[in-house]
Amino acid sequence: MSKRDYYEVLGVERGASEADLKKAYRRLAMKYHPDRNPGDKESEDKFKEANEAYEVLSDASKRAAFDQYGHAGVDPSMGGGGAGFGGANFSDIFGDVFSDFFGGGRGGGRGGAARGSDLRYTLELNLEEAVRGTTVSIRVPTLVNCQPCDGSGAKKGSTPSTCPTCGGIGQVRMQQGFFSVQQTCPRCHGQGKIITDPCGSCHGEGRVEEYKTLSVKVPAGVDTGDRIRLSGEGEAGTHGGPTGDLYVVINVREHEIFQRDGKHLYCEVPISYTDAALGGELEVPTLDGRVKLKIPEGTQTGKQFRLRGKGVAPVRGGGAGDLLCRVAVETPVNLSRRQRELLEELRDSLEGDSSHSPKANGWFDGVKRFFGDL
């Protein structure tokens, strides 16, 4: 199978500068690197092809030979006098490539201290606690520094030894094709030290499990999903690393009367048939106690009344929301004979007078028009 032109492989003009070659190769190396395309044979082949093209074109003598004789000028198998692979300097490019792959450059750095993990604790509150604020005590499972070994993991009186695999660096160099990469040492897991005489309390881990009791001050106005950060109350770091944080996540339980939407509260208020028709006054609950609500005559189911300032004051500031009361008119049940007679008299007196039921009459008129059009 014939090889593609090296300039075509890199996607550059034949007169491309060294900087253009480097930029083009770096782009292809990032795109087709095996670590980004595991198990993809096509990407692996393109990665090797780009390596070969850059190895030739980045070397002035090889590039001149390729420009004059093509592949025959650089490939010994085709009768040319090329020197083969190994002459190109990939280190400056691969430093940038691996910085993007692994979040750092080629430098290893000594392993050891690592920050402890953050913890998450879900705190259940009722609506009143969330609205008014409260202080609660919580018990959280965590990892703390082992006291007998002071977090070192080694038995008291002993010291960890230098890892023979990585020489105390915490990383090992792995060869991949034309270049090498640094990876975490599989023996010491990046610590650079091997514990030969582990602490009996933590078994060499340097940390032990423990329950921690904390007092959490919950500000007024919190809602489900809000988080309270307790700095330094997460898991202990390893080998002297900083402690993580604890995030207390609020979950407000459902209330039997109120529903919350942001800073507003909602509730349903049942009223009698007669109060809806004649009007009246009734007491409705709020988080601050009962208040009187005036019901005008002719109130229908679904009518909503707003009690300003009876909602929730947001935790981030601003005025309190409102309480919105939705009326639900109850149809009377279990009527006595006399009550039925009175309602029948009322029905008879209202029959034929559309002014008492404008919505119902409008609906029936619409039904008549609908069937009349069929």
From Swiss-Prot:
Zn(2+) 2 binds at residues 163, 166, 185, 188. It is found in: Cytoplasm. GO terms for biological process: chaperone cofactor-dependent protein refolding; DNA replication; protein refolding; response to heat. Its cofactor is Zn(2+). It holds the Pfam family DnaJ. Binds 2 Zn(2+) ions per monomer. Its main location: cytoplasm. A zinc finger (CR-type) spans 133-211. Zn(2+) 1 binds at residues 146, 149, 199, 202. Residues 5-70 form the J domain. One of its GO terms (molecular function) is zinc ion binding. Belongs to the DnaJ family. Homodimer. The J domain is necessary and sufficient to stimulate DnaK ATPase activity. Zinc center 1 plays an important role in the autonomous, DnaK-independent chaperone activity of DnaJ. Zinc center 2 is essential for interaction with DnaK and for DnaJ activity. Participates actively in the response to hyperosmotic and heat shock by preventing the aggregation of stress-denatured proteins and by disaggregating proteins, also in an autonomous, DnaK-independent fashion. Unfolded proteins bind initially to DnaJ; upon interaction with the DnaJ-bound protein, DnaK hydrolyzes its bound ATP, resulting in the formation of a stable complex. GrpE releases ADP from DnaK; ATP binding to DnaK triggers the release of the substrate protein, thus completing the reaction cycle. This is Chaperone protein DnaJ. It comes from Pseudomonas putida (strain W619).
